[in-house]
């Protein structure tokens, strides 16, 4: 199986954009925290988060199929991680998130992007961020307009958590 270090190198090989790298690292950090919280394999969950958008920059029309069919199998990425990455984009792959790692990857993807956008407009970034301010931004459809509110809601449902609890957990993760 691929190591965290190998996964980092693979991500850096395919992703040049600092913002997309940051997004992937945030999703990896979120997945790592949830894996530890749920007593799951933190390395697999972290790597799934880190590599979930591996092909987005170079092959946007083929995302995530280019990665899951061509790139990740050759990099010795496990079938579990490949399945999670496949299921994080069900509208593109037809594969719905079913296993725990798949559901959590879906749940962390869009909300991490949204929380990063919220942090960018706050002087203290994540420090002192509250659910109420995030919720207010969520209701403002013009703020981070490219982030799917439906996917954020569905993600919280998939992991059986109120959105406020999911967001609160992630804020805590990103302030560590």
Residue map of PLM features:
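Long, highly charged low-complexity segments enriched in Glu/Asp and Lys/Arg with interspersed Ser/Thr
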Residues: 167-176
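Generic structural signal for well-ordered, non-membrane alpha-helical segments
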Residues: 4, 20-24, 60, 64, ...
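Divalent-cation-assisted or electrostatically stabilized phosphate/pyrophosphate-binding catalytic cores
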Residues: 128-168
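Alpha-helix initiation and N-capping motif
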Residues: 4-8, 44, 78, 131, ...
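Acidic/His-rich, divalent-metal-binding segments that scaffold phosphate/diphosphate chemistry
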Residues: 1-59
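A generic alpha-helix surface/boundary motif
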Residues: 5, 9, 25-29, 64-66, ...
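Divalent metal-dependent catalytic cores for phosphoryl transfer on phosphate-bearing substrates
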Residues: 38-141
